[in-house]
């Protein structure tokens, strides 16, 4: 991006700074970041595809996404630094390795070093804007958890959109797709 044109003395001839406009509701942006944070963690819902970066010693608050097409990708960010790693061939042939195994380790090593630099060391947790609620969700039924639920996780929702039903343990369990399409436990 061209920011400005200057004289040899540094005087500005013309500025080309963009006129920033908010195009995404901050609550929706936060929900996306929250989902991408889960990519880097292991919990009762399973292991995120990028959870290995934590095992490699990167501990700062961050979010990310792995990717595998013909190439291997990992895109991740902290509150003040974005880094995208691509591992691939220049002839569009498959690299035959996932982003979590090829690109994420490179990302983790770079970010561990980058957050040691003064300009990137002040990483902060991602904070939820007003209008985002956190609720405890049962990992089997994807409903609100209660004392009968053996495993649960906290999830972010737009205010007023969280599930209202409580998990039905120890009754019949249906996964999210079964609930969406109205199928019972046996696919009926």
Regions found by a protein language model. Name each.
Residues 1-160, 169:
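A penicillin-recognizing enzyme superfamily signal
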């Amino acid at each position: 991006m061209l920011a400005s044109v200057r004289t040899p003395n540094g005087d500005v001839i013309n500025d080309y700074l963009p006129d920033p406009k908010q195009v995404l509701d901050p609550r929706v942006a936060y929900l996306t970041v929250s989902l991408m944070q889960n990519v880097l963690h292991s919990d009762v819902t399973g292991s995120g595809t990028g959870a290995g970066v934590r095992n490699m010693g990167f501990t700062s608050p961050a979010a990310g996404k792995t990717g595998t097409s013909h190439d291997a990708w990992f895109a991740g960010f902290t509150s003040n630094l974005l880094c995208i790693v691509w591992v691939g061939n220049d002839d569009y042939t498959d690299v035959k390795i996932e982003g979590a195994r090829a690109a994420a380790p490179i990302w983790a090593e770079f970010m561990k070093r980058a957050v040691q630099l003064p300009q990137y060391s002040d990483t902060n947790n991602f904070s939820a804007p007003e209008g985002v609620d956190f609720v405890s969700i049962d990992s089997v039924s994807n409903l609100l958890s209660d004392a009968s639920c053996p495993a649960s996780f906290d999830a972010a929702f737009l205010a007023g959109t969280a599930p209202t039903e409580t998990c039905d343990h120890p009754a019949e369990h249906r996964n999210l797709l079964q609930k969406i399409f109205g199928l019972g436990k046996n696919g009926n």
